[in-house]
Amino acid sequence: MRFKELVFLLKIDEEELLEKLYEEGFFNFAIEENKEGDRLLRVYLREGETLPSFLSNWKILDERLTTPKDWMVELEPFEIVEDVVVDPTEKVTRTDKIVVKLSPGVAFGTGLHPTTQMSVLFLKKYLKKGDRVVDVGCGTGILAIVAKKLGASYVLAVDVDEQAVEVAKENVQKNSVDVTVKRSDLLSEVEGVFDLVVSNILAEIHLRLLEDVSRVTHEKSILILSGIVDTKEDMVREKAQKKGWNLLERKQEREWVTLVMKRS
């Protein structure tokens, strides 16, 4: 599949950008920094797809036709956290580390973003072998795949976006792991009880998740919430506390915060 790639100078903060893109159901994008330190937004349009409306008056810096393989070619394998390697090339054969083969399809979710890195860090720390895990808002499926490779007995990955579900299924297959992937608006299609819930989405969506997450967890379950901009951390923590979740640990990279919680 060929895409039209458009490059813009990022004029708004990253959290506001993600909100606007998600509101329009747009997931084909990447955020990067050039040599001059400018933040750039790359968006990828399928044939017949329209540009998100808020970008219509932004100046286009560059435009070209491309494919998912084209935009991944510049990415080399990299260690997202200690002993966990993301491999966009599918050429890494080492067995001394957890290797995640990744074909994004959508650009966001390659593992380069600090929210993904912090989520993986806490999965390594809190996931116990044999745990049942659900990844809510799975995107490319990277967190679900890591959870399975860390020893989870059962992993469910859900996303409201059909395209993300298809990409996650493709990545699960590439990694030869047993992960169930399906479409669900947060936990609406999720049944059963899980030992660990991980979710790397926006703060406002976490508020919705917290309304229902107790239904699929037990008193010792761990909840990892990432994708929270620091100015909205208190809002999420207050909601979590009201719903019976206590803070175990937090980590911040740049303006992004990840929280680890346990039922009180």
From Swiss-Prot:
S-adenosyl-L-methionine binds at T116, G137, D159, N200. Methylates ribosomal protein L11. It is an enzyme of class 2 (transferase). Keywords: Cytoplasm, Methyltransferase, S-adenosyl-L-methionine, Transferase. SUPFAM superfamilies: S-adenosyl-L-methionine-dependent methyltransferases. Its EC number is 2.1.1.-. This is Ribosomal protein L11 methyltransferase. One of its GO terms (cellular component) is cytoplasm. PANTHER family: ELECTRON TRANSFER FLAVOPROTEIN BETA SUBUNIT LYSINE METHYLTRANSFERASE. GO terms for biological process: methylation. InterPro entries: Ribosomal_L11_MeTrfase_PrmA, Ribosomal_PrmA_MeTrfase, SAM-dependent_MTases_sf. It is found in: Cytoplasm. Its main location: cytoplasm. It catalyses: L-lysyl-[protein] + 3 S-adenosyl-L-methionine = N(6),N(6),N(6)-trimethyl-L-lysyl-[protein] + 3 S-adenosyl-L-homocysteine + 3 H(+).
